[in-house]
């Protein structure tokens, strides 16, 4: 585990769940409440979903995140976590797929196959809630984050053919990271129902 991820996890460990996750959970009309929390980090979104009666299958590529969640959710029969990356995870059927700022780190050479797996796992009328990195983001050319995947707006829209997009927000501005570093953000936040 690198120092930068440890610092990030310490900064976000006590933060509440993301508002877009709550919005996505409220959109779900299916009786089956099964979620995948992809790149779950410290489990803040998983915690919220469990409180709403979901069964959560989570994964993260960083062992420290997995260990944090194993401790946090110890004994919860509705929670499972895997030490996996996007390309290695075995995707169960789900009604809600959460990828909060994690698909950024799916290597571009694996993304097409990963996206197929996500689409196959998400049942009809299931909800996707996640973020994709835009091509103007400063991480695209940075050595600090090799193997990231970035998209144009048109490419993101094409990914969601067969979905009803309910929320689409493009952020293209200077800002800071959770640990206070300045950077240029270019992201697409999407909430969509699979049709």
Tell me what each language-model feature is.
Residues 1-30, 41-90, 109-113, 127-195:
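Class I (Rossmann-like) S-adenosyl-L-methionine-dependent methyltransferase catalytic domain
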Residues 33, 95:
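Conserved acidic residues
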Residues 38:
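Conserved beta-strand/loop positions that form the S-adenosyl-L-methionine
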Residues 98:
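A conserved beta-strand element that flanks and buttresses the S-adenosyl-L-methionine
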Residues 101-102:
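Short catalytic micro-motifs in class I SAM-dependent methyltransferases
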Residues 105:
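ABC ATPase nucleotide-binding domain "signature" loop
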Residues 112-124:
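A short glycine-rich, Lys/Arg-flanked "PGG" loop and its adjoining helix->strand segment in the class I
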């Amino acid at each position: 585990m690198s120092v930068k991820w440890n610092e990030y996890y310490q900064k976000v460990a006590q933060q509440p769940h993301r508002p877009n996750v709550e919005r996505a959970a409220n959109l779900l009309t299916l009786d089956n409440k099964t979620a995948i929390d992809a790149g779950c980090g410290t489990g803040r979104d998983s915690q919220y979903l469990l409180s709403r009666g979901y069964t959560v299958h989570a994964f993260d590529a960083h062992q420290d995140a997995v260990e944090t969640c194993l401790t946090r959710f110890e004994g919860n029969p509705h929670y499972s976590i895997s030490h996996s990356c996007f390309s290695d995870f075995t995707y169960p059927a789900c009604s809600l797929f959460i990828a909060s700022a994690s698909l950024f780190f799916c290597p571009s050479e694996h993304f097409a196959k990963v996206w197929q797996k996500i689409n196959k796992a998400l049942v009809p009328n299931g909800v996707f809630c996640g973020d994709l990195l835009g091509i103007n983001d400063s991480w695209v050319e940075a050595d600090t984050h090799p193997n990231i995947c970035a998209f144009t707006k048109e490419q993101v829209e094409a990914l969601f053919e067969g979905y009803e997009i309910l929320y689409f927000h493009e952020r293209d501005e200077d800002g800071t990271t959770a640990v206070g570093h300045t950077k240029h953000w270019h992201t697409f936040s999407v909430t969509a129902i699979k049709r």
